[in-house]
């Protein structure tokens, strides 16, 4: 299973963690110079490249012309993703309906976004049409975990069962059939794992 574009590289994750730690310990974001110093970058351009990549992936917001113009996107609330257009990253701006004030650390592992569930295929797992699931971005998951998966540009929420190259995405409703994917010949990309459920008024 391949990570999609919005997955962070290990260095980007380290920089994001550094920004979080600085905000939590000092009550302010780091400057670009502090990012350079912390990671041993010889040029501010190297830090800027990583910061812009983080901004493009929706992890931070950059404010031009400010020394401390780095803002954690999560500080504005978790992005609520509605319908996902074919071929686009799940956190593309056009998919974000709103930002909802939830502390991502309430979930373990921490949530990266909320996804609005469409349909009743997971009804017997207590996941109903219109519910919001908290999702931790990951391209790895264990058997039995509820995952957000992309198959041929369609995004689905199902329980994962993997047997070698054969992956089954199992519904929790007898009215729906499992989705079986042979990863040797078909594309299956894991977008994340469900880490929480928020019931909405239906």
Swiss-Prot record:
Keywords from the UniProt entry: Autocatalytic cleavage, DNA damage, DNA repair, DNA replication, DNA-binding, Hydrolase, Repressor, SOS response, Transcription, Transcription regulation
DNA-binding region: 32-52
InterPro entries with a match to the protein in the record: LexA (IPR006200), LexA-like (IPR039418), LexA/Signal_pep-like_sf (IPR036286), LexA_DNA-bd_dom (IPR006199), LexA_repressor (IPR050077), Peptidase_S24_LexA (IPR006197), Peptidase_S24_S26A/B/C (IPR015927), WH-like_DNA-bd_sf (IPR036388)
Active site: 121 (for autocatalytic cleavage activity), 158 (for autocatalytic cleavage activity)
A single BP term in Gene Ontology: DNA repair
Catalytic reaction equation(s): Hydrolysis of Ala-|-Gly bond in repressor LexA
Keyword Transcription regulation: yes
Annotated site (Cleavage): 86-87
EC number: 3.4.21.88
Entry-linked Pfam families: LexA_DNA_bind (PF01726), Peptidase_S24 (PF00717)
DNA-binding found in the keyword field: yes
Entry-linked CDD domains: S24_LexA-like
GO MF term set: DNA binding; serine-type endopeptidase activity
Family under the similarity heading: Belongs to the peptidase S24 family.
Subunit structure, as described in the record: Homodimer.
Its biological purpose: Represses a number of genes involved in the response to DNA damage (SOS response), including recA and lexA. In the presence of single-stranded DNA, RecA interacts with LexA causing an autocatalytic cleavage which disrupts the DNA-binding part of LexA, leading to derepression of the SOS regulon and eventually DNA repair.
Full protein name: LexA repressor
């Amino acid at each position: 299973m391949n990570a999609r574009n919005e997955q962070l590289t290990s260095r980007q994750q380290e920089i994001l963690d550094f920004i979080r730690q600085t905000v939590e310990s000092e009550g302010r974001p780091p400057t670009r110079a502090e990012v350079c110093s912390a990671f041993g970058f010889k040029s501010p351009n190297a830090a800027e490249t990583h910061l812009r990549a983080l901004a493009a992936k929706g992890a931070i917001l950059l404010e031009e012309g400010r020394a401390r113009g780095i803002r954690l996107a999560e500080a504005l609330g978790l992005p609520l993703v509605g319908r996902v257009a074919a071929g686009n990253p799940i956190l593309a701006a056009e998919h974000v309906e709103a930002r909802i004030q939830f502390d991502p650390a309430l979930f373990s592992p921490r949530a990266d976004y909320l996804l609005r569930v469409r349909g009743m295929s997971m009804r017997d797992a207590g996941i109903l049409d219109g519910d919001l699931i908290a999702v931790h971005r990951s391209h790895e998951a264990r058997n039995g975990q509820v995952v957000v998966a992309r198959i041929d540009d369609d995004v689905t929420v199902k329980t994962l069962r993997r047997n070698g190259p054969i992956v089954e995405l199992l519904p929790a409703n007898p009215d729906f059939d499992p989705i079986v994917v042979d990863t040797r010949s078909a594309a299956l990309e894991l977008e994340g794992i469900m880490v929480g459920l928020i019931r909405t008024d239906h």
